[in-house]
Swiss-Prot record:
NCBIfam families: PRK02101.1-3. GO terms for cellular component: cytosol. Pfam families: H2O2_YaaD. This is UPF0246 protein Fphi_1075. The lineage of its organism: Bacteria, Pseudomonadati, Pseudomonadota, Gammaproteobacteria, Thiotrichales. Belongs to the UPF0246 family. It comes from Francisella philomiragia subsp. philomiragia (strain ATCC 25017 / CCUG 19701 / FSC 153 / O#319-036). HAMAP family: UPF0246 (MF_00652).
Protein backbone atom coordinates (compact mmCIF):
# COMPACT_ATOMS: atom_id res chain seq x y z
CA UNK A 1 0.00 0.00 0.00
CA UNK A 2 1.27 3.44 -0.94
CA UNK A 3 -0.16 6.81 0.10
CA UNK A 4 0.25 9.88 -2.10
CA UNK A 5 -0.22 13.42 -0.80
CA UNK A 6 0.27 16.92 -2.19
CA UNK A 7 3.24 19.10 -1.29
CA UNK A 8 2.83 22.52 0.34
CA UNK A 9 3.82 25.99 -0.80
CA UNK A 10 4.92 26.80 2.76
CA UNK A 11 8.25 25.21 3.70
CA UNK A 12 10.27 25.32 6.92
CA UNK A 13 14.03 25.09 6.56
CA UNK A 14 14.80 26.62 9.95
CA UNK A 15 14.05 23.83 12.42
CA UNK A 16 16.66 21.09 12.76
CA UNK A 17 15.53 17.47 12.42
CA UNK A 18 16.58 14.23 14.05
CA UNK A 19 19.28 12.18 12.36
CA UNK A 20 18.05 9.70 9.78
CA UNK A 21 19.48 7.91 6.77
CA UNK A 22 18.54 10.68 4.35
CA UNK A 23 18.04 9.88 0.67
CA UNK A 24 18.62 11.71 -2.60
CA UNK A 25 15.76 12.87 -4.87
CA UNK A 26 14.46 10.24 -7.29
CA UNK A 27 14.44 12.30 -10.50
CA UNK A 28 17.69 14.28 -10.33
CA UNK A 29 18.12 14.75 -14.09
CA UNK A 30 14.54 15.94 -14.56
CA UNK A 31 14.82 18.30 -11.58
CA UNK A 32 18.02 19.76 -13.01
CA UNK A 33 16.34 20.45 -16.35
CA UNK A 34 13.38 22.10 -14.62
CA UNK A 35 15.36 24.26 -12.21
CA UNK A 36 17.72 25.40 -14.98
CA UNK A 37 14.67 26.48 -16.97
CA UNK A 38 13.28 28.36 -13.96
CA UNK A 39 16.60 30.13 -13.41
CA UNK A 40 16.05 31.94 -16.73
CA UNK A 41 12.91 33.67 -15.41
CA UNK A 42 13.31 37.23 -14.15
CA UNK A 43 11.31 38.51 -11.16
CA UNK A 44 8.57 40.11 -13.29
CA UNK A 45 8.24 36.94 -15.38
CA UNK A 46 7.89 34.81 -12.23
CA UNK A 47 5.22 37.20 -10.97
CA UNK A 48 3.15 36.69 -14.14
CA UNK A 49 3.85 32.97 -14.48
CA UNK A 50 2.88 32.11 -10.91
CA UNK A 51 0.34 34.91 -10.40
CA UNK A 52 2.01 36.07 -7.19
CA UNK A 53 2.98 39.41 -5.64
CA UNK A 54 6.22 41.22 -6.62
CA UNK A 55 7.65 40.58 -3.14
CA UNK A 56 6.91 36.85 -3.31
CA UNK A 57 8.27 36.72 -6.86
CA UNK A 58 11.57 38.12 -5.57
CA UNK A 59 11.70 35.42 -2.90
CA UNK A 60 11.02 32.70 -5.48
CA UNK A 61 13.68 34.18 -7.79
CA UNK A 62 16.22 33.98 -4.95
CA UNK A 63 15.22 30.40 -4.03
CA UNK A 64 15.59 29.15 -7.59
CA UNK A 65 18.89 30.93 -8.20
CA UNK A 66 20.31 29.54 -4.95
CA UNK A 67 19.17 26.03 -5.89
CA UNK A 68 22.13 23.72 -6.58
CA UNK A 69 20.92 20.67 -8.55
CA UNK A 70 24.36 19.06 -8.30
CA UNK A 71 24.39 18.88 -4.51
CA UNK A 72 21.76 17.83 -1.98
CA UNK A 73 23.24 17.79 1.50
CA UNK A 74 22.22 18.75 5.02
CA UNK A 75 23.97 22.08 4.39
CA UNK A 76 21.50 23.21 1.72
CA UNK A 77 18.60 20.75 2.04
CA UNK A 78 16.20 19.17 4.51
CA UNK A 79 14.15 15.96 4.55
CA UNK A 80 10.87 16.60 2.76
CA UNK A 81 8.52 15.25 5.42
CA UNK A 82 9.93 17.73 7.95
CA UNK A 83 10.06 20.64 5.49
CA UNK A 84 6.55 21.04 4.09
CA UNK A 85 4.35 22.91 6.56
CA UNK A 86 0.92 23.47 4.98
CA UNK A 87 -2.46 22.29 6.29
CA UNK A 88 -1.92 18.64 5.32
CA UNK A 89 1.36 18.62 7.22
CA UNK A 90 -0.21 20.25 10.26
CA UNK A 91 -2.50 17.23 10.40
CA UNK A 92 0.39 14.82 9.83
CA UNK A 93 2.66 16.39 12.50
CA UNK A 94 5.70 14.48 11.25
CA UNK A 95 7.93 15.97 13.97
CA UNK A 96 5.99 13.97 16.57
CA UNK A 97 6.15 10.61 14.76
CA UNK A 98 8.59 8.08 16.19
CA UNK A 99 11.63 6.95 14.24
CA UNK A 100 10.19 3.55 13.27
CA UNK A 101 7.08 5.22 11.83
CA UNK A 102 9.19 7.65 9.78
CA UNK A 103 11.23 4.73 8.46
CA UNK A 104 8.00 2.88 7.64
CA UNK A 105 6.72 6.01 5.86
CA UNK A 106 9.82 6.01 3.66
CA UNK A 107 8.43 2.90 1.92
CA UNK A 108 4.73 3.76 2.05
CA UNK A 109 4.35 7.53 1.58
CA UNK A 110 5.12 9.69 -1.45
CA UNK A 111 4.65 13.41 -1.99
CA UNK A 112 3.83 14.67 -5.48
CA UNK A 113 5.65 17.80 -6.62
CA UNK A 114 5.81 20.09 -9.64
CA UNK A 115 9.61 20.26 -9.37
CA UNK A 116 10.61 16.93 -7.81
CA UNK A 117 7.95 14.70 -9.38
CA UNK A 118 7.82 12.26 -6.48
CA UNK A 119 9.44 12.82 -3.10
CA UNK A 120 9.99 10.21 -0.41
CA UNK A 121 9.77 11.40 3.21
CA UNK A 122 13.53 11.30 3.83
CA UNK A 123 14.56 12.68 0.43
CA UNK A 124 16.62 15.84 0.84
CA UNK A 125 14.98 18.82 -0.85
CA UNK A 126 15.95 22.42 -1.45
CA UNK A 127 13.61 25.40 -1.28
CA UNK A 128 11.43 25.94 -4.36
CA UNK A 129 8.02 27.00 -5.57
CA UNK A 130 6.46 25.28 -8.58
CA UNK A 131 2.89 24.07 -8.50
CA UNK A 132 1.87 21.25 -10.82
CA UNK A 133 -0.68 23.52 -12.50
CA UNK A 134 1.90 26.21 -13.37
CA UNK A 135 1.76 26.97 -17.10
CA UNK A 136 5.38 26.35 -17.91
CA UNK A 137 6.54 24.06 -20.73
CA UNK A 138 9.49 21.68 -20.59
CA UNK A 139 10.51 19.98 -23.83
CA UNK A 140 7.28 21.37 -25.28
CA UNK A 141 5.14 19.70 -22.62
CA UNK A 142 3.12 21.10 -19.72
CA UNK A 143 4.17 19.85 -16.28
CA UNK A 144 1.43 17.20 -16.12
CA UNK A 145 2.62 15.63 -19.37
CA UNK A 146 6.28 16.07 -18.47
CA UNK A 147 5.82 14.13 -15.24
CA UNK A 148 2.96 11.69 -15.85
CA UNK A 149 4.82 8.81 -17.51
CA UNK A 150 7.83 9.19 -15.21
CA UNK A 151 5.76 9.30 -12.02
CA UNK A 152 3.51 6.41 -13.07
CA UNK A 153 6.46 4.20 -14.07
CA UNK A 154 8.18 4.89 -10.74
CA UNK A 155 5.00 4.08 -8.82
CA UNK A 156 4.66 0.80 -10.69
CA UNK A 157 8.25 -0.02 -9.77
CA UNK A 158 7.40 0.55 -6.11
CA UNK A 159 4.22 -1.53 -6.37
CA UNK A 160 6.28 -4.44 -7.67
CA UNK A 161 7.83 -4.49 -4.18
CA UNK A 162 4.50 -4.20 -2.34
CA UNK A 163 2.34 -7.11 -1.25
CA UNK A 164 -0.90 -5.11 -1.32
CA UNK A 165 -1.00 -3.12 -4.54
CA UNK A 166 -3.25 -0.26 -3.45
CA UNK A 167 -2.73 3.46 -4.00
CA UNK A 168 -4.39 5.61 -1.34
CA UNK A 169 -4.97 8.99 -2.96
CA UNK A 170 -4.88 11.74 -0.35
CA UNK A 171 -3.57 14.31 -2.84
CA UNK A 172 -5.56 17.17 -4.36
CA UNK A 173 -6.95 16.90 -7.89
CA UNK A 174 -4.23 19.29 -9.09
CA UNK A 175 -1.55 16.80 -8.12
CA UNK A 176 -3.24 13.41 -8.52
CA UNK A 177 -3.78 14.20 -12.22
CA UNK A 178 -0.02 13.76 -12.64
CA UNK A 179 -0.57 10.00 -12.26
CA UNK A 180 -1.91 7.94 -15.17
CA UNK A 181 -4.58 5.81 -13.49
CA UNK A 182 -5.04 3.57 -16.54
CA UNK A 183 -1.37 2.59 -16.57
CA UNK A 184 -1.08 2.10 -12.82
CA UNK A 185 -0.52 -1.50 -11.67
CA UNK A 186 -2.56 -1.01 -8.51
CA UNK A 187 -6.05 -0.38 -7.21
CA UNK A 188 -6.79 3.35 -6.87
CA UNK A 189 -8.70 4.48 -3.78
CA UNK A 190 -9.77 8.11 -3.30
CA UNK A 191 -10.49 9.38 0.21
CA UNK A 192 -12.69 12.42 0.82
CA UNK A 193 -13.72 14.35 3.92
CA UNK A 194 -16.97 16.28 4.26
CA UNK A 195 -18.60 18.49 6.88
CA UNK A 196 -22.31 18.46 7.78
CA UNK A 197 -23.62 21.96 7.08
CA UNK A 198 -27.36 22.31 7.76
CA UNK A 199 -28.04 18.72 6.79
CA UNK A 200 -25.86 18.78 3.65
CA UNK A 201 -22.37 17.30 3.45
CA UNK A 202 -19.81 19.61 1.88
CA UNK A 203 -16.06 19.49 1.34
CA UNK A 204 -14.45 22.44 3.14
CA UNK A 205 -10.93 22.94 1.78
CA UNK A 206 -9.02 23.82 4.93
CA UNK A 207 -10.67 21.03 6.97
CA UNK A 208 -10.23 18.45 4.19
CA UNK A 209 -6.53 19.27 3.87
CA UNK A 210 -5.86 18.81 7.58
CA UNK A 211 -7.94 15.61 7.57
CA UNK A 212 -5.74 14.21 4.78
CA UNK A 213 -2.78 14.70 7.08
CA UNK A 214 -4.61 13.08 9.99
CA UNK A 215 -5.50 10.08 7.80
CA UNK A 216 -1.92 9.78 6.54
CA UNK A 217 -0.68 9.73 10.13
CA UNK A 218 -3.33 7.15 11.11
CA UNK A 219 -2.35 4.77 8.30
CA UNK A 220 1.37 5.11 9.02
CA UNK A 221 1.15 4.78 12.81
CA UNK A 222 -1.13 1.74 12.59
CA UNK A 223 0.85 0.14 9.73
CA UNK A 224 -2.41 -0.35 7.82
CA UNK A 225 -2.08 -2.68 4.85
CA UNK A 226 -5.70 -3.32 3.83
CA UNK A 227 -8.64 -1.13 2.89
CA UNK A 228 -11.07 -2.43 5.51
CA UNK A 229 -8.90 -1.12 8.36
CA UNK A 230 -9.00 2.40 6.92
CA UNK A 231 -12.75 2.47 7.63
CA UNK A 232 -11.97 2.40 11.37
CA UNK A 233 -10.53 5.93 11.19
CA UNK A 234 -12.36 8.06 13.79
CA UNK A 235 -10.00 10.97 14.45
CA UNK A 236 -11.26 14.55 14.95
CA UNK A 237 -14.88 13.28 15.00
CA UNK A 238 -14.70 11.92 11.43
CA UNK A 239 -16.48 8.63 10.78
CA UNK A 240 -16.77 6.42 7.70
CA UNK A 241 -19.92 7.25 5.72
CA UNK A 242 -21.11 4.19 3.81
CA UNK A 243 -23.82 6.05 1.88
CA UNK A 244 -21.35 8.53 0.38
CA UNK A 245 -18.73 5.86 -0.38
CA UNK A 246 -18.30 3.34 -3.17
CA UNK A 247 -15.77 0.75 -4.37
CA UNK A 248 -13.25 3.43 -5.38
CA UNK A 249 -14.04 6.15 -2.84
CA UNK A 250 -14.10 6.25 0.93
CA UNK A 251 -15.88 9.25 2.39
CA UNK A 252 -15.56 10.33 6.01
CA UNK A 253 -17.96 12.85 7.50
CA UNK A 254 -18.55 14.77 10.71
Amino acid sequence: MIIVISPAKSQNFETATAKYQFTQPIFKDQITKLINTLKHYEVDEIEKLMKISPKLAEEVFTKHNNFDPKSYSELNSKAAIFTFSGDVYKGLEADTLDKKTIEYAQNHLLMLSGLYGLIRPLDLMQAYRLEMGTKIKIDGEILYKYWQDKITAQLNEYFNQQQNKILINLASNEYSQAIDKKSLDAKWLDIDFKENKNGTYKTIGIHAKKARGLMTRYILENRIENISDIKKFNVADYKFNLELSNENLMCFTR
